[in-house]
Amino acid sequence: MLKIGIVGGTGYTGVELLRILSQHPEVNIEAITSRKEAGMDVAQLFPSLRGRIELKFSDPAEANLEKCDVVFFATPNGIAMKQVPSLLDAGVRIIDLAADFRIKDIAVWEKWYGMPHACPELVAEAVYGLPEINRDRIKTARLIANPGCYPTAVQLGFLPLVESGAADLDHLVADAKSGVSGAGRNAEIHTLFAEAADNFKAYGVSGHRHLPEIRQGLSQAAKHPVGLTFVPHLTPMIRGIHATLYVKLLKEVDLQALYENRYVNEPFVDVLPAGSHPETRSVRGSNLCRIAVHRPQGGDTAVILSVTDNLVKGAAGQAVQNMNLMFGLPETLAITHLPLFP
């Protein structure tokens, strides 16, 4: 049994990790940390886990994380990078669900995240945890940078066309919408029910932290720098991401065949029949990314629709998928939950 530690177990990604890992047959959760809730039963804070998780939250200073096989960081940006070096030295493998190790250019990371990086020497080693492009590297990694929620949906939607050479790489457009859980569990005015319900708005139009992450991944896939306009939106739903992606085609291509062939062996990417319109509720609670491709009026613009659950494939589910790969377990183990409906 793998010994698991979770740093930051009280947010939405933390409780989603607990939900998934509590049903995983090959793991034992050793520690769940929270300074604020130290000493409290996990099931008291999260009644949904009653009968599944019998642990108490522990203070990070008292948790014996060095005895774990793998530690998940479900913490705000800037926390993991301060603790990861000592854990790696102790032989612990790391999966960071925050952004500390995603962006390879340290200056770019520091610009977007507004703080100096505490361990820049480890960034080059970190493997970007998108299995659909880095599966082999993930298997041997010590340190995984779990992708962001928007970057997962957007990159999986763009990848086949970007890799094919059939796309105008200078003018990619990603119009993405997220549920309010993507903003985290802290109390903020814009996510209050009275503010978010019956409302819809764009944000971060001049620049969002996920922009350099998406651009980095697509540029690596294309082996060429890409130009990307990324506009996120906040929608009045709890969980889910819907990305509408626009690509100008440079040559004739069978879009349906291209996407089906690219993802035929991917257990968590579902390419829908031609003309489909995926809905966020079709992936709610699952580790799936569902994609549909369109070519309006047979013109030179492809429209790709990509939907995920931001807390599962966009966070905790993908983290467990990476853990399975790292430890030689079946990739789909404990993350084949069917979507919730209605």
UniProtKB/Swiss-Prot annotation:
PROSITE patterns to which the protein is assigned, alphabetical: ARGC
Pfam families: Semialdhyde_dh, Semialdhyde_dhC_1
Membership in a protein family: Belongs to the NAGSA dehydrogenase family. Type 1 subfamily.
One annotated Gene Ontology cellular component of this protein: cytoplasm
CDD domains: AGPR_1_C, AGPR_1_N
Entry's EC annotation: 1.2.1.38
Cellular compartment(s): Cytoplasm
GO molecular function annotations of the record: N-acetyl-gamma-glutamyl-phosphate reductase activity; NAD binding; NADP+ binding
Reactions the enzyme catalyzes: N-acetyl-L-glutamate 5-semialdehyde + phosphate + NADP(+) = N-acetyl-L-glutamyl 5-phosphate + NADPH + H(+)
Biological role stated in the UniProt entry: Catalyzes the NADPH-dependent reduction of N-acetyl-5-glutamyl phosphate to yield N-acetyl-L-glutamate 5-semialdehyde.
Metabolic or biological pathway: Amino-acid biosynthesis; L-arginine biosynthesis; N(2)-acetyl-L-ornithine from L-glutamate: step 3/4
Record organism: Nitrosospira multiformis (strain ATCC 25196 / NCIMB 11849 / C 71)
Presence of the UniProt keyword Iron-sulfur in the record: no
InterPro entries according to UniProt: AGPR_AS, AGPR_type-1, NAD(P)-bd_dom_sf, NAGSA_dehydrogenase, Semialdehyde_DH_NAD-bd
Keyword Magnesium included in the entry's annotation: no
Protein name: N-acetyl-gamma-glutamyl-phosphate reductase
UniProt entry keywords in alphabetical sequence: Amino-acid biosynthesis, Arginine biosynthesis, Cytoplasm, NADP, Oxidoreductase
Entry annotation: catalytic residues: C149
Any one Gene Ontology BP term: L-arginine biosynthetic process
Gene name of the record: argC
Root EC class: oxidoreductase
